Amino acid sequence: MSTPTLVVVSGGPGTGKTTLAHELARVLGCPAIIRDEIKQGMVMSHPGYQSGGDDPLNHPTLDAFFGVLKVLLEVGVTVVAEAAFQDRLWRPNLEPLTGLAHLRVIRCTTDADIAHDRIIQRAKEDAHRAAHGDQELLDSIAAGGHSLDSFVPISLDVPTLTVDTAHGYQPALPDIAAFARASDDGASPERMMES
């Protein structure tokens, strides 16, 4: 069995991670495991759930997310995994998976104004987003307690590609897929994208 690839789609709130992860998984022909969707499923089995504060579902969600990834990688499934993946919270959980898969990181970025507008839009249109406290995030941003520019990306020494999601994808989806499919030969993402 050859080694599968774990494609990590990361970025701050409203940067287009989930949309890109689903599109990339479709192009690659593999599953997309979305952290927020796992939590939304947990919320469905907890009537009266309220997000915010010391959320009792955050740790079980994290455990389920990485548990599913581990099971898939152990049997050789290439997978796209999407979550914020801020360094201090997520790196300790990703590092053990590097022994099971080639790891590639995609960092979604966009202007703070665009991210803010996306958060407002999804909070209005998607009732499932209540599981994630989007309104609390917006309130914190408005009060100056949180900045969308405060995101700290994963600091792993693995091939990494930054994708601007402001207006479509830059680089384009076929190039992102080529990055995800590239062999784990130690080449820098920039060299892989030029070939």
Q: What does each model-identified segment do?
A:
Residues S2-L6, G76-V77:
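Pre-Walker A (Motif I) flank of P-loop NTPase domains
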Residues V9:
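Hydrophobic anchor at the beta1->P-loop junction of P-loop NTPases
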Residues P13:
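The conserved Walker
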Residues G16:
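Conserved glycine(s) of the Walker
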Residues T19-E74:
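Conserved substrate/cofactor phosphate-moiety recognition/catalytic segment
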Residues L57-H102:
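Glycine-rich phosphate-binding loop used to anchor ATP phosphates in small-molecule kinases
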Residues G99-Q121, V163:
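Conserved phosphate-donor/acceptor-positioning beta-strand/loop module used by diverse small-molecule
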Residues K124-P174, E190-S195:
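Small-molecule kinase domains that catalyze NTP-dependent phosphoryl transfer to phosphate-bearing small molecules
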